[in-house]
Amino acid sequence: MSEAEARPSNFIRQIIDKDLADGKHTTVHTRFPPEPNGYLHIGHAKSICLNFGIAQDYQGQCNLRFDDTNPEKENLEYVESIKKDVTWLGFDWSGEVCYSSDYFDKLYEYAIELIQKGLAYVDELTPEQIREYRGTLTEPGKHSPYRDRSVEENLALFEKMRAGEFAEGQACLRAKIDMASSFIVMRDPVLYRVRFAEHHQTGDKWCIYPMYDFTHCISDALEGITHSICTLEFQDNRRLYDWVLDNITIPCHPRQYEFSRLNLEYTVMSKRKLNQLVTEKLVTGWDDPRMPTISGLRRRGFTPSAIREFCKRIGVTKQENMIEYSALESCIRDDLNENAPRAMAVLDPVKLVIENFAAGTVETLTLANHPNKPEMGDREVPFTRELWIEREDFREEANKKYKRLVLGKEVRLRGAYVIKAERIEKDEQGNITTIFCSYDPETLGKNPADGRKVKGVIHWVSAEKGVPAEFRLYERLFTVPNPGAADNFAETINPESLVKVQGYVEPSLVEAKPEFGYQFERMGYFCADNKDSSPQALVFNRTVGLRDSFAKIDEE
C-alpha cells in the first residue's frame, strides 16, 4: 500500500510483541484462508486487513490459502474473485497462492498416523446417527458401536474409503477423543468423509476429503504460520486444533487467536442469506452496489483506502458488537471529500432560459476540479442561454431561509453569473416547465457592482451541451438495523434502496472512468458504473450522500 498509515494497537498485536520480545518467534507469519465458495464481503475485509496488515507492519509474511476441502460448493470463479479482491484492497500475499488441497497427501498420512496410535477409527453410523449419538450441551454423547475396532481393521477400512468402496454417508473417519467432553467439538469429531465429487485443483484423484478442523491446523503448521487468527465462532475449535497438532508428528505448532467478527447495521453477512438475495433476485447479483461484498462496494464507488480506514477505525477486540452503517459511510465520505474531483450534474432537471444571453452563444468557463487542491487542475464547462437546474432549487415564493432561486429574486450559478428569476411557464397539470431569467454580465467571478447581497449558489448544466445520464440512487438495503434477527429478513428489504432517475451531466464526464469517484456538487459522491455505463449511455452510481441521510431517521 502506498500511504503510510499509523500502526494500530490491539490485543493480538500485543501478543505478537510479547512473543517477539520473549524470543518465542523471530518472525511473524500469518495467513488469510477463505473457502472459495462465495464472494468476499466487508467482514472478510476486516480479516484481510488484520492478517496482511500484521505481516506488513512486522516485516513478516502472509499467505493467501484457499481452504478448498468441500469440492461440491467451490469453483475457480470464486478463487479468481477472491484473489482480485485481496489485490484490489492493496495487499500482496507471500509467494505462490496456497491451497489446502496442496496438502491432501500429507493429510492422509497424518490420518494414518492417528489410526496407528489408536486415536482415530472408521465409523459406519449414518450422519443422522452420529448427530444423535453426539448428545447435547446438557447430555453427554455415547460411544459408537464401531469405536473399538482394532488398528488393523481401521487401516483396512480407511483404505477402502479411499478406494471408493464405501458410498457417501456410509463411512467416515472420526477422532477418538472424549464423548463426554463439555465441548461438543471434542466428541469424536469427523476427520474425513466420502465425497464422489471432482475437485477444481485435484480433479478426481480423491473420493475422500478432510474436514475443516483437521485440515486447517495441519495446513497452518505445514506453512510455518506463527499466529493463526480467526473469528470468535472458532473459539471452541481451538481445543481440537491443539489436539490434532499435539497427536501427530509435526515440528511446528501454531497458536490460534480469536477476535470478534464484523457485524454491520442494515446489512447481512451470512453467506446463506447473501446467496438467498441473489438466487431470489432480490438484488441484481453478487456485485450489486447494495451488497456488502467487496465487488459490490467497489462497483458502488468505495475505495480500497476507505475500506482499510474503516477496518482500522473499528479495531480488533473480542467484544461482539454492531457497527453503525454510518461509520462505513463516514470513511468513504472523508476519502472522497479529500480526493474526488468536483463536477456538476442535475438529477431532477427543469429548464432555465437566460433571456438576455445571446442565443447560439457558448461561453467556456474555467472551474477548479477541487476547491482546496489547485494541483488537481481545472476543467472547461460550457455556459449557454438554456440550462438545466434542479427542480428543488426553484420556488415561486419562499421564506428567508430558502437560499436558492425564487421568483423575482437572485441567486448565483456555480462558477458563473448572478441570475434573477423573472417569470415561469407551466404545463396543464400546473408543473413548472421553464424558468425565464435575466443575468448580470458583470458578475462572473465577482459580486454585483452596486453592493447588493446574493447569498445562494446553485449548480447547473448546459441544456445544449450537457449529456444525458442515468443516476442510480442507492440507500441501505434494509429498513431495520439488524435484519438478520428478523423472522424473514427478506421482508425488511428497503423498497427505496435503489431509485433510478434521468438527468444531465457536464460534458467532461463523458470520459468518466468506471469506479472513479466524483463529487457532484451539492448532490453527493458518484462513480460511473463498471458494468452498464458507456460514453454513449452514461450510468452513475451514488456512492454516498454529502451527509448521513439516515441520521434524522435514527434519532426519531
From Swiss-Prot:
**Quaternary state and interactors:** Monomer.
Which GO terms fall under biological process for this protein?
Answer: glutaminyl-tRNA aminoacylation; glutamyl-tRNA aminoacylation
Q: Where in the cell is it found?
A: Cytoplasm
Q: Does the keyword Hydrolase apply?
A: no
Which EC class heads this enzyme's classification? ligase
Q: What is this protein called?
A: Glutamine--tRNA ligase
Q: Which gene encodes it?
A: glnS
Keywords carried by this UniProt record: Aminoacyl-tRNA synthetase, ATP-binding, Cytoplasm, Ligase, Nucleotide-binding, Protein biosynthesis
